[in-house]
Amino acid sequence: MTVTLERRESTSLWERFCSWITSTENRLYIGWFGVLMIPCLLTATTVFIIAFIAAPPVDIDGIREPVSGSLLYGNNIITGAVVPTSNAIGLHLYPIWEAASLDEWLYNGGPYQLVVLHFLLGVAAYMGREWELSYRLGMRPWICVAFSAPVAAATAVFLIYPIGQGSFSDGMPLGISGTFNFMLVFQAEHNILMHPFHMAGVAGVFGGALFSAMHGSLVTSSLIRETTENESPNYGYKLGQEEETYNIVAAHGYFGRLIFQYASFNNSRALHFFLGLWPVVGIWLTSIGISTMAFNLNGLNFNQSIVDSQGRVINTWADIINRANLGIEVMHERNAHNFPLDLADNSLLPVASSSPSINS
């Protein structure tokens, strides 16, 4: 018997590191995008938790009226938030070393900018990591394309909108009630409910939820039973099996009779592509809408669009919405010297035909 011994080529530490980073045998795939994602998301998460619990009030409007957002300063889980960076900072990058002290950095809302920028980098890297793992496994790249929709939405509200409005103070606060406040103010200032792209996003999200529920219930109701009546049908499924796990013909026939013939898919690939496409395109369109409204290309305006023969306005729902928008905008302005543009831009109404003479 002949035994051949070959000298094992020595690999450098860097090569072993590269092999470990890109290995698909790890329990959790890291990848080169993961090298960026992990520190960014850890930083964003850590600072968010600390700021949500203990950050001091922030002068969000830059008018020396700090707003409290943390739990230790009187808030609860519902009202708490990481308050956006001060309007006094605007769009300037505001790392800790740009402030004169840590107290100043906290007062001006530095944690918000730190969390948002690291979070956006992290989720973008997560999307790239999805593509990277798909590539290494020989899969198609549609998973990261689908995830691009929430990435686009987050980028729109946390980065594009502040850029368009000229200050990070206009970004969405990182909290529950802060999110609702952002939505109300956005409606008041941009009439988003009357924007076609927002309507498409609503159809995408709610339609996607409806289609998902319909698909899941149809599949669950048409499983191919491989077990006896006394056992769960789930025991008849083996991970990775080549056979179909449900009868798409039965599901197609059921749904075709429930609605009409052409309302159902008879091709599983086309069906699942549609299920992925519908909500993704809707959220893409909403993100584009937010990004255009960031630069004040607002929703449609049908205010006072109907008048009678005497020129009197006949109010429609558009006028009701406009009245609500004005009320929200007035309540939003905490600084009494800052009137909403809708109220401040009206032409002056004369109160006298001529000025009275004043005897000196």
Swiss-Prot record:
Residues with site note (Stabilizes free radical intermediate): H190
GO cellular component, one term: chloroplast thylakoid membrane
Primary localisation category: plastid
Family: Belongs to the reaction center PufL/M/PsbA/D family.
Annotated positions binding pheophytin a: Y126
Function summary: Photosystem II (PSII) is a light-driven water:plastoquinone oxidoreductase that uses light energy to abstract electrons from H(2)O, generating O(2) and a proton gradient subsequently used for ATP formation. It consists of a core antenna complex that captures photons, and an electron transfer chain that converts photonic excitation into a charge separation. The D1/D2 (PsbA/PsbD) reaction center heterodimer binds P680, the primary electron donor of PSII as well as several subsequent electron acceptors.
Residues reported to bind Fe cation: H215, H272
Keyword DNA damage attached: no
Propeptide residue span(s): 345-360
Name the record gives this protein: Photosystem II protein D1
GO MF annotation list: chlorophyll binding; electron transporter, transferring electrons within the cyclic electron transport pathway of photosynthesis activity; iron ion binding; oxidoreductase activity, acting on diphenols and related substances as donors, oxygen as acceptor
Record text on cofactor binding: The D1/D2 heterodimer binds P680, chlorophylls that are the primary electron donor of PSII, and subsequent electron acceptors. It shares a non-heme iron and each subunit binds pheophytin, quinone, additional chlorophylls, carotenoids and lipids. D1 provides most of the ligands for the Mn4-Ca-O5 cluster of the oxygen-evolving complex (OEC). There is also a Cl(-1) ion associated with D1 and D2, which is required for oxygen evolution. The PSII complex binds additional chlorophylls, carotenoids and specific lipids.
Subcellular location: Plastid, Chloroplast thylakoid membrane
PTM text: Tyr-161 forms a radical intermediate that is referred to as redox-active TyrZ, YZ or Y-Z.
Reactions listed under catalytic activity: 2 a plastoquinone + 4 hnu + 2 H2O = 2 a plastoquinol + O2
Originating gene: psbA
E.C. numbers: 1.10.3.9
